[in-house]
Amino acid sequence: MNMSDRHLAELVVDLDAIAHNVRVFQEAAAPAGVMAVVKADAYNHGVDVVAPAMLDAGVEQLGVATLGEALHLRGSLNDLGERYHSTPITAWMWMPGDELADVFAAGITVGVPSLAHAKSLVEQAERALRETQVSAPVRASLMVDTGLSRSGVSPAEWQQTVELLAAHTDCVDITGVMSHMASADEPQSEANDLQATRFAQAIEFCRNHGLPVPCNHIANTPATLNRPDLAYELVRPGVGLYGIDPAGAGVELRPAMTLRARVITTRVVPKGEGVSYSHTWRAQRDTRTAVVALGYADGLPRSVSGKMQVTINGKVYPQIGRVCMDQIVVELGPADDTEAETSAVQPGDWAVIFGEVGTSIDEFAELAGTISYEVLTMPRGPRIARVFRGGKPDFSGDGSRTVATADDMRHLGEQLGAQLEAGTVVVLSGPLGAGKTTLTQGLAAGLGVKGRVQSPTFTIVRTHRAGQRGIGLLHMDAYRLLGADVDEGIEPGRHIDRNEVLDALESLDIDADIDDVVVVAEWGRGVVEPLSDKVLDVQIDRGSVSGAADAASEIRTVTWHWG
């Protein structure tokens, strides 16, 4: 039996949150493209799943640290199908003596951080072309040290490195210049303007010496959000794509990671007894406790002992005593407490350490005396199962999805529209204000039709001409099409056939061929199903974090099934 079959802890990764964050950075960077940094296993989120999810969301390129990461990523993407094969991947950490033949063959763009690296690259690229291992110049990105003093060609080596690479454009294609900000999370730092000036000078120097450098990038997460002047042709965000805003830019990023573990037992600790090693906590009264299956062997730092809180069934409880190798203890409350929250915690319940509820990643980082970047990479080891939620939905079968914002609803609609065929009837149901028209706006974008999608409140039926896909859209309020009231619906027992619906459309001078369009019918249940044998019923319901319907909440559950 695989260990993960009996796992007691999970790292839950929300792919919808990642897609949302990608869209935030696309909007901030436009018209520049986005290179997503997916080093360190996508900041511990699982690169094999996260990278294609980012590409599906609109990321143009991927960046990693090491050549090993790059080769793994290329193989993983190749396994997913042809549409991912040509994804540009850049890696910037390697040694001058490393053999690069397999890197060249995989089409990886290598970063050049020193003169020694440039010499090694030129030598190996010349040999690869001479021996026909490659048929075109190999791709590289010239790294310049603008002030971080870590990686990047130093000022002392800069001219010689540029001249060397400019003399060997027959075997090395320098795609651009890249650098890294030292203090972009401190917008007022003078270092930012200094690095910006040096980067612009480096690009100009390259172009004056015969290197066109068409694709340049220096903006990390905070620079993308705070310094639009540094967008250039690409931005290169990392931690922000996973929902962390290190500069407090105020954008609506959604953290994608939740760490949780099972409660394995509960007990009553008598007054005066100690808990965990060295008895750093003692019961001041008879106290009910729970043991949670997570410890420092799983990446939970001992430094948070007695400081952290966990969330179980929506209620926050303090962790007590020392963090152990495999487990922690949580105080539930007085043993004689008859409140449901105290006694309701049972073995098998999930205790959330940080993430979607309770303690945020930023708050946990403060408790641990570190930064959110490190917290993301803390959970580790085979005892924690990585679980993915959301991602690109498959509308070929029945399913459901929870969306948090109107933008997410449009994006879901766009994914739906991209998968629909001509002749499909989509029946949209849900209360007023649920988001039916918002979903339709996204669906229209996925179909690529012409014209602005508006609510059918005033115009009962609206046609949208086909775009490149050759599929049009017919958007209607189906109840009003047949003279019914939304609140009352279709009269009980009334039978509606295909001809009645077509006659109603013809009476409004709508002459679209149903087989050439997608029909989206708001309030369409019991009305438009006779139009096609391909009917997708979509229900939108309001929701909230607690699960109860909440008119003020943007959270929606979208459920679909084929009729």
What are these regions (language model features)?
Residues 393-415:
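N-terminal pre-Walker A segment at the start of P-loop NTPase domains
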Residues 5, 10-12, 30-217:
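Active-site-proximal beta-alpha core segment in soluble small-molecule metabolic enzymes
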Residues 487-563:
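Short phosphate-coordinating micro-motif centered on Lys-Gly-acidic
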Residues 432:
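The conserved Walker
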Residues 426-428:
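Hydrophobic anchor at the beta1->P-loop junction of P-loop NTPases
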Residues 1-19, 27, 69, 95-97, ...:
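Active-site anion/phosphate-binding pocket segments in diverse small-molecule metabolic enzymes
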Residues 436:
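Conserved lysine of the Walker
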Residues 449-465, 476:
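Short beta-strand-centered segment that lines the nucleotide-binding/catalytic pocket of NTP-utilizing
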